[in-house]
């Protein structure tokens, strides 16, 4: 099984009734890839980060078997950032801050080596970007 994940690799600041973080690695594509790494060995990532994104976090993805050749690093720019506060039920939350940064102009490029993906998982991107990804694939994945 092969998976192509296209979505956000980001920084998050999260507050819950049980604790608070200031700046941690987040993003839909990050956790799609990490979760999938327990079930398949062919995971391809397409996303974008700024030069502020830690290289050790990219290595962590690679150590989980994630192919990061499709991860764009925009020098001189900042990584997408989201901050939220979860309520007592841990199901509802308020967004406190969203900084699109590199995500605002993200134009996904699907490497040729990713074209044979069996499954496609799209993260929380605008529909036009999601559609572009689907249309750029030679074969329609599941």
Region annotations inferred by a language model:
Residues 8-9:
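Active-site metal-binding loops of divalent metal-dependent hydrolases
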Residues 12-23, 40-122, 136-139:
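Conserved N-terminal subdomain of the carbohydrate kinase-like
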Residues 142:
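ADP-ribose/adenylate-binding Rossmann-like module
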Residues 30-44:
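A short, N-terminal amphipathic alpha-helix
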Residues 1-4:
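Extreme N-terminal starter segment of soluble prokaryotic enzymes
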Residues 19-34:
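Short catalytic helix/loop segments, enriched in acidic residues and glycine
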Residues 124-126:
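Short, structured patches in soluble enzyme cores that scaffold and shape functional sites
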Residues 54-55, 128-131:
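Short, well-ordered alpha-helical microsegments
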């Amino acid at each position: 099984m092969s998976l192509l994940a296209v979505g956000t690799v980001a920084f998050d600041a999260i507050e819950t009734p049980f604790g608070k973080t200031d700046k941690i690695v987040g993003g839909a594509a990050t956790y799609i890839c990490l979760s999938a790494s327990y079930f398949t060995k062919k995971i391809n990532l397409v996303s974008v980060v700024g030069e502020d994104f830690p290289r050790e976090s990219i290595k962590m993805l690679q150590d989980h078997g994630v192919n990061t050749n499709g991860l764009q690093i925009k020098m001189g720019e900042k990584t997408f950032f989201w901050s939220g506060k979860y309520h007592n039920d841990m199901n509802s939350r308020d967004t406190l801050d969203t900084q699109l940064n590199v995500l605002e102009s993200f134009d996904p490029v699907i490497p040729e080596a990713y074209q044979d993906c069996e499954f496609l998982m799209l993260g929380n991107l605008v529909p036009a970007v999601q559609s572009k990804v689907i249309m750029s694939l030679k074969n329609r994945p599941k």
